[in-house]
Amino acid sequence: MTTKNMNTPPGSTQENEIDLLRLVGELWDHRKFIISVTALFTLIAVAYSLLSTPIYQADTLVQVEQKQGNAILSGLSDMIPNSSPESAPEIQLLQSRMILGKTIAELNLRDIVEQKYFPIVGRGWARLTKEKPGELAISWMHIPQLNGQDQQLTLTVGENGHYTLEGEGFTVNGMVGQRLEKDGVALTIADIKAKPGTQFVLSQRTELEAINALQGTFTVSERSKESGMLELTMTGDDPQLITRILNSIANNYLQQNIARQAAQDSQSLEFLQRQLPEVRSELDQAEEKLNVYRQQRDSVDLNLEAKAVLEQIVNVDNQLNELTFREAEISQLYKKDHPTYRALLEKRQTLEQERKRLNKRVSAMPSTQQEVLRLSRDVEAGRAVYLQLLNRQQELSISKSSAIGNVRIIDPAVTQPQPVKPKKALNVVLGFILGLFISVGAVLARAMLRRGVEAPEQLEEHGISVYATIPMSEWLDKRTRLRKKNLFSNQQRHRTKNIPFLAVDNPADSAVEAVRALRTSLHFAMMETENNILMITGATPDSGKTFVSSTLAAVIAQSDQKVLFIDADLRRGYSHNLFTVSNEHGLSEYLAGKDELNKVIQHFGKGGFDVITRGQVPPNPSELLMRDRMRQLLEWANDHYDLVIVDTPPMLAVSDAAVVGRSVGTSLLVARFGLNTAKEVSLSMQRLEQAGVNIKGAILNGVIKRASTAYSYGYNYYGYSYSEKE
């Protein structure tokens, strides 16, 4: 038994280091793939940077000043701190449909005119070749919807100001300066600056679509917190257009602010004009009451103390009135726990206490003085209110006639000379990094997913003797390989027809040399066997068993030995294609009793050995192999040939190898480098041993010299020359 220990021993202490070296080796092995993918992504990034439409950015600066309060309340500025300008509502106003809608109407932004280029790369190529874009000036355009959908028109420039307009179901000719109408479409072209044959695509979107598009490229932000300085920015591919749009938005915002301020002043002025007669009437009544009382009391005048108290009371009342007006404004902006609101309430409480103190002093005066004081206070308070209203009326009249609002444009719109997109250097760097990341990730993922045997030590760790490691023949691989199944698979597909025979067509190949080494090993391995029949099978399909067995037959035949090659793979055997011999009469016909030996044995002249091909595919391959004729064939061959090589199907696919193996003296199992796992090889050999087959060991076929494998297992030559560990 060669599979003495099927359990994998514990990993060495250098396992992590080996894994790291293996991954580094994988990157080195696939360096061409990594370089190619990275270069591809970098070139894509370069092409994108060169061909994509440059995007420019324009900006303008607008200042929102603190709104001026009522002139009556100006005396409170020392008591109540000024609040910062409210920028958030102004930002929302700038982005509103009211402001943007006016700009869209002014600049006809509903109309879309685009020159027609070759898809994807046409515009960028025209820009790289310095081709001047055409210009189309439209003074009026109306394109109705068609079946509820926006329709596009194609305008083709002609000679001498003529053009052709194509739409859904119509084609009409027009001329610059003349109105064109067709099927509801109305168009007036003011000017055309383009070569004949140039095409433009015309379309018209709704106002809401235009506003949404504008909002997508227009941003407003406050330059610094509570500064009132608003920065308006816009991006687009037309630097002149975005400048005009920004200036229009800023001007429309300024005009609406002025109009709003004028409307407020007008309403306040109307209110004052209604209130002034009433206040004047109340003042006249108060003065008349005071005069009547004095006449009744023989012109009673206030003493000095009463006059002083009167002035104080009137002053306190005026301040309380101002606080009442101010509270009405503050309550709309702040809650009662706000510092500004609390300062106002504290001031009111102080004034209320002062008024109570003054009222106590008045209560101590004679009744006549108290009445005169009360009437005088009414007159003074009414006169103060009346004068304040008169002053405010004059201020509002002046403000209305010269309204400037609380907004001003600091910096008109300017477009930066260099585009903000694409960022060419950044795109190229990102493309390089992305390509490197994807290629390295794919290589490492493939390495992680790969579980195939890559070194003889992996099999020997499972107690499996490795008789030879046969390198991949690049010469043969180039002539037979089709393609991989996918990126993450190691399995190669090869042709099974019109393929060269390596042992004859390129006998100096390293793979043939490795088979010669196998011939030497087999000479000693088969010295004590019961017969000279060698069975070669594989763990799974595509392991290369036919290549190994056929090459071994040729190599042994070259040493002047009589060799018979039997293709016992009755399902997928293709040795007849390899040897270019007939497959009409083969093993299946002999086992079925249709043909005799002299009819199925053919001589392969180039290889120097005899061949029994597969024959026609039978419906019952396993049953045929179990017949006595198969045993009789092997006994006859053992007597008439120096060596008989039997190529059987893969062990894990079908049980044919176990059937044939009981009649042979020596068996070898072929494992494909990177394809078959150690577990598959162990399981195959276990099944053969359970069937009573004398399985000597394994052959590692298709070995590829890799840096990753060399780092992990440290062998330097295929099959029989391992580096010594110091």
Swiss-Prot record:
Keywords: ATP-binding, Cell inner membrane, Cell membrane, Kinase, Membrane, Nucleotide-binding, Phosphoprotein, Transferase, Transmembrane, Transmembrane helix, Tyrosine-protein kinase. Pfam families: AAA_31, GNVR, WZC_N, Wzz. Residues 54-424 are periplasmic. Autophosphorylated. Dephosphorylated by etp. It catalyses: L-tyrosyl-[protein] + ATP = O-phospho-L-tyrosyl-[protein] + ADP + H(+). Disulfide bonds: none annotated. It is an enzyme of class 2 (transferase). Its EC number is 2.7.10.-. GO terms for cellular component: plasma membrane. The chain crosses the membrane at residues 33-53, 425-445. It is a multi-pass membrane protein. It is found in: Cell inner membrane. Residues 1-32, 446-726 are cytoplasmic. Signal peptide: none annotated. The keyword Cell membrane applies. GO terms for molecular function: ATP binding; protein tyrosine kinase activity. Belongs to the etk/wzc family. This is Tyrosine-protein kinase etk.
